[in-house]
Amino acid sequence: MNKEQLEKMTHGKGFIAALDQSGGSTPKALKEYGVNEDQYSNEDEMFQLVHDMRTRVVTSPSFSPDKILGAILFEQTMDREVEGKYTGDYLADKGVVPFLKVDKGLAEEKNGVQLMKPIDDLDATLNRANERHIFGTKMRSNILELNEQGIKDVVEQQFEFAKKIIAKGLVPIIEPEVNINAKDKSEIEKVLKAEIKKGLDSLNDDQLVMLKLTIPTEANLYKDLADHPNVVRVVVLSGGYSRDEANKLLKDNDELIASFSRALASDLRASQSQEEFDKALGDAVDSIYDASVNKN
């Protein structure tokens, strides 16, 4: 593990850019960027277009390491190059800590939750991540209803994978998303917090994780998770809120920082001039940074 990057992730001021839309969500991400499905004829072309979009984001002067601590990448992005360097090296050289999305998507809903599908090639992926100088990983589950068994299963699966990831020298971001429209969202979050606390308490002193959570209904609910000795940082997802709404809610939560995807890229368009693009990205970065750093 890179100690300088760990120090930046633990104490740095800023947020994490989530650039990890995978195969399933790529057409939607491209469409929002202004690239329609008739502009590519196969998956390779689609992934090239999305890589071009991400390259435009990370090479922009607005994508500044003074405000962006880290970036989460999709596997395809990790294996591609930006300006002649693997993406992870490009980011690290720029001062942005690289993470890799390692999950294979969600299983069918059961007990009010969606566990992660099996990650059969996790070992090989983590070896490649180390070769590519990746600092940490991210994996997402989804909680839709108040079901204690389901929530327990989600957290147990996350920590089971997290321990394997830690053993490879990487820092896992554990992401048990709570659907923002869940009927008992506030209650779900209390159960989730208790289960996460159990998982954290089961770790050895040197086993470090990060948490990526939905912004809680009750402000500062997760503050003591952020203070847990095994937690590097707690970040939050935008989860379907608009950027303004997500920023507003985030400001009420001390110590939590953003890890936004759609809310970061929502004003970016393929048709923008470089100047327009940099300004739109800069405005988004500034507002998300402000919500992550300057609290109410």
Curated annotation (Swiss-Prot):
GO terms for molecular function: fructose-bisphosphate aldolase activity. The keyword Lyase applies. GO terms for biological process: glycolytic process. It is an enzyme of class 4 (lyase). Its EC number is 4.1.2.13. Pathway: Carbohydrate degradation; glycolysis; D-glyceraldehyde 3-phosphate and glycerone phosphate from D-glucose: step 4/4. Keywords: Glycolysis, Lyase, Schiff base. SUPFAM superfamilies: Aldolase. It comes from the Bacteria. It holds the Pfam family Glycolytic. The keyword Transport does not apply. InterPro entries: Aldolase_TIM, FBA_I, FBA_I_Gram+-type. The active site is at E175 (proton acceptor), K212 (schiff-base intermediate with dihydroxyacetone-p). It catalyses: beta-D-fructose 1,6-bisphosphate = D-glyceraldehyde 3-phosphate + dihydroxyacetone phosphate. Belongs to the class I fructose-bisphosphate aldolase family. PANTHER family: FRUCTOSE-BISPHOSPHATE ALDOLASE. This is Fructose-bisphosphate aldolase class 1.
